[in-house]
Amino acid sequence: MNILIRITEVIMVSFVLTMMTSCHWDDTIYHHYYSVNDPWLQHEVVIFELPVFEKGGPYSVEVDVRYSKSFPYHDLWLLVQHNVEDSATWKIDTIKCSLFNAAGYSSGDGLVGIFQLTTPFTTSLTPDGSSCARFKVKHCMSDSLLRGITDVGIRVKQ
């Protein structure tokens, strides 16, 4: 009888631990990708219209890039504009996405020649909560025709 109780306890503890480790709280409040033309022209802007955020924060923002081995450089430079903190004011910044390391291997995750890399943009975004916000993303590479980029995405986390 004592062994039966012990086995039941072990099974229950195992069950509870399994349930606790399988639960995952995802703090993403916005995540979306847009496909870009190949080649991606320098004047083409990808626009993300985000829902109204609750006032406060801070929120963190990441830029996701999907790319192929045909991308001719190690790094991708992006120009990112947003009006999250004040809908009438646009903030502009550049972000460096290191797609390949010095040995030529992809820095992102992926299979079959398509990779994805997430690069932090900011960790201290505090929206005013009054209107929807926008992000605008375009490449600022010296080549006006950029090959090998398939998608660009924005992820906002609380």
Where are these regions (language model features)?
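Post-signal-peptide N-terminal segment of Sec-exported extracytoplasmic proteins
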Residues: V45-Y73
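C-terminal motif of bacterial Sec signal peptides marking the signal peptidase cleavage site
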Residues: M19-S22
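Short acidic/polar inter-strand loop motif in beta-rich domains
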Residues: Y67-S70, F115-L125, H139-I149
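Bacterial signal peptide processing site
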Residues: H24-D27
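An anionic, turn-rich surface loop/hairpin at beta-sheet edges
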Residues: I95-T126
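Bacterial N-terminal signal peptides that target proteins for export
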Residues: M1-M12
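Exposed low-complexity, polar/acidic, P/S/T/G-rich flexible segments that act as propeptides
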Residues: L78-N83, S142-Q158
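Noncatalytic modules at the cell exterior or secretory-pathway interfaces
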Residues: K55-V63, T123-M141
